[in-house]
Amino acid sequence: MDPNMSRPPDYSLPPYDDEDLHTPTGYSPAAVRLLTSEEHYDPHPHTYVPPSSPSQDQIPIQTSPTRPASSNSPSASVSPSPSKSTPSPLNPPVEIPPPLFASQTDLNMSSEAGERAFRPEPGQQDNTQANIHNQQEQPSPNPPSYSRSVAESQSLLPNTPVHGGSAAKLQNRNRNSVHVAFADLPTDLPEIPEGISERRRVHKEHQHLGLEANPTVPPRPVSRLKNPNSHDHVPSIRSPRNLNYQPSVRSSRSGSIFDDAPSLGPPGGGSYMSYDTREYGSPQRPWTPSSRMSDFTRSDLSRPPPNHDMYEPSDLNGSPRPGTPSSRYGGSPRRPLPPAPLFHGSRQAVPPFADDATVSIPLHDPMDDDVFGPESDLSDARPHPVDRSSYMSAESQDTLNEGDPDDYDKFEHYGPAPSGAQERRGVRAPQMARKEVQLINGELVLECKIPTILYSFLPRRGEVEFTHMRYTAVTCDPDDFVERGYTLRQTFGKTVRETELFICVTMYNEDEIGFTRTMHAVMKNISHFCSRTRSRTWGETGWQKIVVCIVSDGREKIHPRTLDALAAMGVYQHGIAKNFVNNRAVQAHVYEYTTQVSLDSDLKFKGAEKGIVPCQMIFCLKEKNQRKLNSHRWFFNAFGQALNPNVCILLDVGTRPSGTSLYHLWKAFDTDSNVAGACGEIKAMKGKYGRNLLNPLVASQNFEYKMSNILDKPLESVFGYITVLPGALSAYRYHALQNDETGHGPLSQYFKGETLHGQHADVFTANMYLAEDRILCWELVAKRNERWVLKYVKGCTGETDVPDTVPEFISQRRRWLNGAFFAAVYSLVHFKQIWFTDHTFARKILLHVEFLYQFIQLMFTFFSLANFYLTFYFVAGGLTDPKIDPFGHNIATVIFHILRYSCVLLISTQFILSLGNRPQGSRKLYLASMIIYSIIMMYTTFATFYIIIRQLTSKDDDIKMGDNVFTNMIVSILSTIGMYFIMSMLYLDPWHMITSSAQYFILLPSYICTLQVYAFCNTHDVTWGTKGDNVMKTDLGGAVGKGETVELEMPSEQLDIDSGYDEALRNLRDRLEVPEPPPSDSQLQEDYYKSVRTYLVLTWMIGNGILGMAVSEIYSARGIGDNYYLRFLLWSVAALAVFRAVGSTTFAILNVINMIIEGRVRLTLKAPRWFGGVKDRVSDKMSSVSSNLRN
């Protein structure tokens, strides 16, 4: 097979030689005949079989013998034979020019063969004729067995040019030939008969009758030769079509005789696939020359319809264009151009000429053969191509290397890029339609189908909870949710289930990363519940006992990408929520769905193949921003009351609990019925490879969190009262939270801060509600006639983001410090409530011991500013002694005085910044103050270690327990820093001592001074972003209109104007008193808070100032060994550290005992029988010991 024919040609459009009138032209197998080209006649005729159909009058045509013309003869004469009757199959055949090859009787010849046969070189003319004669003598392997119509016979008329003559195209004498440039014609050219042709007559009749816009052409009569292999006449499946052609100016080539040639199909192995454009007027590829005849029996030989085609120029640099691969299939060498790109804004095709003669387009630049140049009529048809290769074909590496790389930058193949935001392809705006919906108990409740894509990969589809999302528009307060008849899916129908665990996730404006981090961790914890197949509570269907509730504080505050994440899980759908129902404002939008997929923090779907089980979800989107306390009221009073769960877990968006944290948290309630609340360990998120610890602020918080979970939480858990259960990871027993019959209880006190107004809200209560997670702790332990305790669960851990910038860190600690301080004051003032509880006497004694410890801690917190200054004053001032000065020349004295006055000025600056500036507006000043505090702390630490080392290495002083320096310094340091190391090793978690301890001790003065000062100076700020008065007033009316005119109401009569003036004069004369409006509740509340803030700051500042000045003046002239206040301070710190260490050690021992007891009970069950009753007695004894320890 010819390698050039490995694929079909890239052009497949009809030839260009005629329009609706088909004039036969030429006989060249190359399908080309120039009007002015010279060709030689082949004197060897071949036999022609005439048509056999006698139905119509046909004109048999014979070729007259030709004679060679002299060089002076301009052309050869051609004369038609006289008209005769229609020949029968028995008549002698008519001679016609022979085909090129005997084997190509199907007329499917290549252009190369045609050129060699009909345009020989002058020196090879004789040889060519000889070769043709030899080929004629050979028998044809496939004799012609097909019939041909008269029109086809006319297309085979031979021209008889003489050497030096020119071939001429037959023209209709009645047609205007203004567009055709004729050559000199011979005198004996055949003439077309007078009158209109049969084809033209039928065409005009159709136009006259108005049958169709493009009339069809009746099939020509055909004559058949008897062929046993051929079938009967098969109707054509291709509708008759007319041709339109691109207008041009001049032509030097004739049409092709192979327009009607039968097709043998393109060679196999082609991979070409065309494409169509979406715009009218773009070139299409519905027809190829090879598709003109599907078989030899077709009678439908009409032309294809007009396509507004565009072709290559007829000439190539002034010479006829050579043949192309399509010549083998009867195509034209003048190739149609490929279609324009899909989105190219090409104009409509230019209407064709009425003339049937097509001519070429002149090229002004002989080096430029591009018809789409700037001077062409087709310049706007499509973008400028880089080269002549098709857009559908890929360029070879050689072509890419040879081409100019700048050409690709000069031309835009697809036009300019669209500006502005573009809609995604295939995405449309939602089509809204009005529907009548039946209200349920007067409320709007909708069951909405989930998206098709989500439904397609769900493993479970049997229940409505998997296939439909339920939307409820809640128009009432959360306290009235159940009373107004609102229900959840877990309370009706087939999905009625008992809820064991109710998880609340509160969020404000967090992005999708924080939300998916928390939600994916929760779903993995639910999978762990279902994996405990041996549990009596959980198992494969354990997910049916867990409900996750997401409460978002404000519809306009939620992050849009978080909504997208919820929509991807099937929980949320856009366009369903409504603002009001029957003129009642919607307070919250509740979405319910049981999702089976999860999104991790990388926003990748995780499903059942990753162990994810179904999760019952409730998404409550509050209409307004009403603070986190209101979100908890929706959770506890609305949804909790409807579900009545056993345990409620509170999480914040951004917190990532570990894989088994929620199970350990629930297990604490399951094993001890007296536990009302529990919490886990909060860890700072360190980032990949702990890179977040490079930030000193993050490292110091990591150390603080670790030591709190090692020393403080275990100590308080031993006593049974944890001062704060962090809202980021805590759990409560729902039954313990309920109010008593009089309406008083933990929840009523907890939500009291949401309804405080005016002076009735004292500043202590208001600040206490800033740390709302401390409220429930005290109310649960002090609940009347109950013995609830709080527990710390070491096995429950959760990572959370910590502030990494100074302003965010200060703002967070302001709420924490004020809430902790005022909550401690509140619990100490109301400690008598413990006496009315049902706790055991031992538990009450332990609780009073804890109150004493909290009181001491509170006193140290209140005077922490003075204690820091005095510690620095005495320790750093100890180096001013000339005997101890490590630098000599009184350099230590100079450094001490500089740092001393810097410390005093810095503390004063902190008050000024805290009273009048936000941390976000004074970022640099706060950062500078923290750096100076760090320098002071580093010098104080250096002085401490220098004094200790000098004391140990001094030969004059003996080291003994009664020595003041040894007692005050060494014992104090070992009882703090040393205890930190010992307890960290005991809990097998010492790494924070290596990575974060130095940062914490350096930033310790900033914790004491910067954070404490800012917190006390902003006790009046108890708002959580409450909206101001942003409602437009309407009491004065308005001016409404369009354009330059408006409509308004105003006095129109002169009497009204005079009356108003008279009233104004009378008021001035009578001196009427104008009543002053009373101050608003918000103004009274703000004034009250600020006044309390002033009294509190003055009290705190004066107390610390008096303590610092008095102690520094009394002991300024004495040494460290004789400073009794410093001795008291250091020993108090050591005592508190030891107390915390003892409590933490007790907690660790009790945990080990519980583990041993549980293990021993399991072992005794497997003890051999010869133990007798000893086994049972040991088990009972250990169980009683365990119960006593827990109570």
UniProtKB/Swiss-Prot annotation:
Q: Where is the composition biased (Low complexity)?
A: 54-88
Name the segments for region: Disordered. Answer: 1-172, 202-407
Q: Indicate which residues are glycosylated according to the record.
A: 4, 108, 525
Any one GO biological process: chitin biosynthetic process
Bias-annotated ranges (Polar residues): 102-111, 124-133, 146-158, 239-255, 285-294, 390-400
User: Which family does this protein fall into?
Assistant: Belongs to the chitin synthase family. Class II subfamily.
Q: What is this protein identified as? A: Chitin synthase 2
**What organism is this sequence from?**
Gibberella zeae (strain ATCC MYA-4620 / CBS 123657 / FGSC 9075 / NRRL 31084 / PH-1)
